Curated annotation (Swiss-Prot):
One Gene Ontology term of the molecular function aspect: DNA-directed RNA polymerase activity
Pfam families: DNA_primase_S
Binding residues for Mn(2+) 2: D109, D111, D305
Names of the cofactor(s): Mg(2+); Mn(2+)
Keyword hit for Transferase: yes
Protein name: DNA primase small subunit
């Protein structure tokens, strides 16, 4: 893949926003069929420009205005905020207290740095194929709960461009949720609790909630290959001591003896399971199958940035924004192929600009002469960004179908009266 040089970013962004950004689909998403008057016009966008210049409360009348502004500013990063009571770009003219965030998608932000206490391969901003499995498990667990436990239909998963993933839940009813309800949802989805000083972050008992059981079933599919082989979490004393800190002291000696006798993480894990589930230890109310589950959850369960989800007015990085450090595009993820998603094959801005350059001069000239934006944005179709835009379009199709279904229902009800 084309190496990315951050020094070239200003020039690359010009080309990206002029020829490659999927404006039509982007506007179609945030306009939500134009059902609610001024929905798009009251949406906040924020731009981060070169040298960390940050501009909040941007808003636009239509797709064309958004395009012009983005091509003029060439933002390093785009964030999407709430739909407000008034146009965000006029917030200074509104009476104090009257300018209120009214609606926004329910969003989730999962960042690999929050797993630094349990991943051995990388730390801070670094990721590799070994620890990416954490994101796969997180997406599977959260998506299943949003779909089955809450009945949310329209969930867009997006790669952040570096070390994490975001989820946008776009159902109409969800966009109207209060901050209190959002807090309740994120609380339901949170199991790993406590800061750096807290060693044991997951606490279960005999009454295990169905959400937890279903999450454990997902983790089980990945646990051996990810945790026992890939991360080798019981490789040596330093590592098994971390796990001993999560189980009752009454079984420490028995576990230690087995850990010293066996020579691999899978064998040592099997020993831990037997000890935790032995009839002798089960008499101790702290032992049982939930002991191994607590360890699995602490090492593999999603770690959400709670504050991002709670606030209606919280900004989150936009899909199709470019990560200024890696150059990777923040692309939608095809959830049907979530296990195959590889962050290292996500196109960089340098790669897609190069691909565009390789299009014949004749074709380019023909396109440049096309005045209207409908033709100009076809540029992405000639690059490796195309399949990701297709994923986005499929998501939009489902949103449209759902909206039409709701409108038909409403008109049928009115006919009945």
């Amino acid at each position: 893949m084309e190496p990315f040089d951050p020094a070239e970013l200003p020039e690359l962004l010009k080309l990206y926003y002029r020829r490659l950004f999927p404006y039509a689909q982007y506007y179609r998403w945030l306009n939500y069929g134009g059902v609610t008057k001024n929905y798009f016009q009251h949406r906040e966008f924020s731009f981060t420009l070169k040298d960390d210049i940050y501009i909040r409360y941007q808003s636009f009348n239509n797709q064309s205005e958004l395009e012009k502004e983005m091509q003029k500013m060439n933002p390093y990063k785009i964030d999407i905020g709430a739909v407000y009571s008034h146009r965000p770009n006029q917030h200074n003219t509104v009476k104090l207290g009257a300018f209120q965030a009214q609606e926004k998608e329910l969003v989730f932000d999962i960042d690999m740095t929050d797993y630094d206490d349990v991943r051995r391969c990388c730390s801070s901003a670094d990721i590799c194929s070994k620890c990416w499995t954490l994101m796969t498990m997180a997406m599977r667990i959260i998506d299943r709960a949003l779909k089955e436990d809450f009945g949310f239909k329209h969930r867009l998963w997006v790669y952040s461009g570096r070390r994490g993933v975001h989820c946008w839940v776009c159902d109409e009813s969800v966009r109207k949720l209060s901050s209190a309800v959002r807090s309740g949802i994120v609380e339901y989805l949170s199991l790993v609790k406590g800061g750096q000083d807290v060693k044991k972050k997951v606490h279960l008992n005999e009454k295990v909630h169905p959400f937890v059981r279903k999450s454990i079933n997902i983790i089980k599919k990945y646990f051996e290959e990810y945790a026992l082989v890939g991360q080798d979490i019981l490789e040596n004393k330093e590592n098994w001591d971390k796990i001993l800190a999560l189980v009752p002291e009454t079984i420490h000696d028995e576990l230690q003896r087995g850990f010293q006798k066996f020579h691999s993480s899978p064998q040592r894990w099997e020993h831990l399971r037997k000890v935790a589930n032995s009839s002798q230890n089960m008499k101790n109310d702290k032992c049982g199958p939930w002991l191994e589950w607590e360890v699995m959850l602490q090492y593999c369960f999603p770690r959400l940035d709670v504050n991002v989800s709670k606030g209606v007015n919280h900004l989150l990085k936009s899909p199709f924004s470019v990560h200024p450090k890696t150059g990777r595009i923040s692309v939608p993820i095809d959830f049907h192929k979530v296990d195959q998603f590889d962050p290292f094959t996500v196109p960089t801005i340098s790669a897609i600009c190069r691909e565009l350059d390789m299009v014949s001069t004749h074709e380019k000239e023909k396109e440049e002469n096309e005045a209207d934006s409908k033709h100009r944005v076809r540029g992405y179709k000639k690059t490796s960004l195309a399949p990701y835009v297709k994923v986005f379009e499929q998501f939009l199709e489902n949103l449209d179908k759902s909206r039409k279904g709701e409108l038909l229902k409403k008109s049928d009800l009115q006919k009945d009266f």
